[in-house]
Design a protein with these regions (language model features):
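Amphipathic alpha-helical assembly/interaction segments
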Residues: 1-135
Length: 135
């Protein structure tokens, strides 16, 4: 009996959720979904490339471009982690969850591939340059 009583005490403190609580939860969910949609849909891979191209003056300063992409991916992982957390807590509808994650996965894969190709191209050109100058 005492275990049962202890269990009951640990249950959700609000026995009857008030209308205000429901209202707050709905507002929080709608606001979060709107923000997530805005954040995700404004960053297509092409927009990221354009943004980084402007920041890094692509051909002349490849290390700046790589830095900008790394910075973007860092922010991107924060958004991704937040999304997963909010989904686990039930703040995302299934529709938003199903729309958001494939898009985020695609951005992540394409951005990483682009970053890898950029670094490999730079390393390859440095090796060629070094070989030519030695011989």
């Amino acid at each position: 009996m005492s275990k049962n009583q202890t269990y009951k005490k640990r249950m959700v403190p609000i026995e009857k959720p008030t209308r205000e609580l429901y209202s707050l939860l709905i507002d929080a969910r709608l606001t979060f979904q709107r923000d997530v949609r805005h954040t995700l849909w404004q960053y297509t891979v092409q927009e990221v490339r354009n943004m980084i191209g402007h920041i890094g003056v692509a051909d002349n300063y490849p290390q700046l471009r790589e830095s900008a992409l790394s910075q973007f991916l860092t922010e991107f992982y924060k958004v991704s982690a937040d999304l997963k957390m909010y989904n686990e807590k039930g703040f995302l509808t299934q529709k938003v969850y199903l729309q958001a994650f494939p898009l985020m996965d695609s951005i992540e894969r394409q951005s990483k591939a682009w970053l890898t190709n950029t670094i490999n191209a730079r390393v390859g050109s440095n090796e060629n340059g070094a070989t030519e100058s030695v011989s």
